[in-house]
Amino acid sequence: VWSSEKFITGFSDLPIMPGMQELPDANISFDTASGRIVEAFAKTEQNVEKILSFYKNVLPQLGWRVKKDTMFVRDTEILNLDLRKERDSVIVQFSLKPQ
């Protein structure tokens, strides 16, 4: 089970990949009648394959099911990872919404 205490801001149990830096100014988080909506951003110099491999390995240990390469489902929530290359880095957008 994941033992790091570093989690993405706004998520109680979404670990931040080692070497990844959060971009907190862009984060949003609010509750709706159907559930919570959270968006957070982070930047890393790791490649897309390593990022996806990390989260496909870690998230199932936290109860998430892999739905697609960048989509995970748990209970009534969907977590999407949107990865964008930007020069030498990859920007990862973590989006959580009700199913």
Where are these regions (language model features)?
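An acidic-aromatic pocket/loop used at catalytic or ligand-binding sites
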Residues: 2-99
